[in-house]
């Protein structure tokens, strides 16, 4: 069997959790709120504040869902099926915020440009 670290592959044991950021605007805030509340109810994930302003590296208003790896395995497909046009950006938490946002992110819908300058 090949040692994956010798060919640059990373082990997933460094992932302590995931964040899924649901993006919205003034017209879709209610839709995003319902989606995030249902996700929290169904999967037991932690729902963060609903930000009706830009926060962190995010280019749109957003609400964060925080999940452990087991929850995320169920949450991501559910978000894919139920986002109804909302954009979702998800990333692992490995302790390297820049790489997690820049290199390890998953987009549901149109990928947007993040402001990564705060991780420099």
Q: Can you name each region flagged by the protein language model?
A:
Residues 1-120:
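Long, contiguous binding/interaction regions
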